[in-house]
């Protein structure tokens, strides 16, 4: 019996994950209170959502926030582990990180 892979997700779980369908203006408004309390927010994006994260950084920069961008290499994990996913051990990918601070 073989099980199909449902979704490939990064094992890196720090910060807020930006997807291609994330509404950027709503995200900025929603995170404004957290940014005022904590002083900084960490966002992350992979693959097709990376241009979306760059656009988010431009919006924050225009509003006068300090931004820093970095990359990290992460391992992608399958939600359902089967024999095939055990054989494909090395599935590495890049994550773009955006830190916004006052």
Swiss-Prot record:
GO terms for molecular function: nucleic acid binding; ribonuclease P activity. GO terms for cellular component: nucleolar ribonuclease P complex; nucleolus; nucleus; ribonuclease MRP complex. Its EC number is 3.1.26.5. It is an enzyme of class 3 (hydrolase). Keywords: Hydrolase, Nucleus, rRNA processing, tRNA processing. GO terms for biological process: endonucleolytic cleavage in ITS1 to separate SSU-rRNA from 5.8S rRNA and LSU-rRNA from tricistronic rRNA transcript (SSU-rRNA, 5.8S rRNA, LSU-rRNA); intronic box C/D snoRNA processing; tRNA 5'-leader removal; tRNA processing. It is found in: Nucleus, Nucleolus. Its main location: nucleus. It catalyses: Endonucleolytic cleavage of RNA, removing 5'-extranucleotides from tRNA precursor. Pfam families: Rpp20 (PF12328). The keyword Nucleus applies. Belongs to the histone-like Alba family. Component of nuclear RNase P and RNase MRP complexes. Component of ribonuclease P, a protein complex that generates mature tRNA molecules by cleaving their 5'-ends. Also a component of RNase MRP, which cleaves pre-rRNA sequences. This is Ribonucleases P/MRP protein subunit POP7. It comes from Schizosaccharomyces pombe (strain 972 / ATCC 24843) (Fission yeast).
């Amino acid at each position: 019996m073989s099980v199909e892979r449902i979704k490939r997700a990064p094992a890196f779980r720090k910060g807020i994950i930006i997807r291609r369908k994330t509404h950027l203006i709503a995200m900025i408004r929603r995170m404004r209170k957290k940014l005022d309390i904590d002083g900084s927010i960490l966002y992350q994006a992979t693959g097709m959502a990376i241009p979306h994260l760059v656009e988010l950084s431009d919006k924050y920069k225009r509003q006068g926030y300090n931004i820093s961008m970095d990359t990290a290499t992460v391992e992608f994990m399958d939600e359902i582990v089967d024999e095939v996913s055990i054989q494909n051990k090395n599935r590495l990918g890049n994550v773009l990180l955006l830190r916004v601070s006052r």
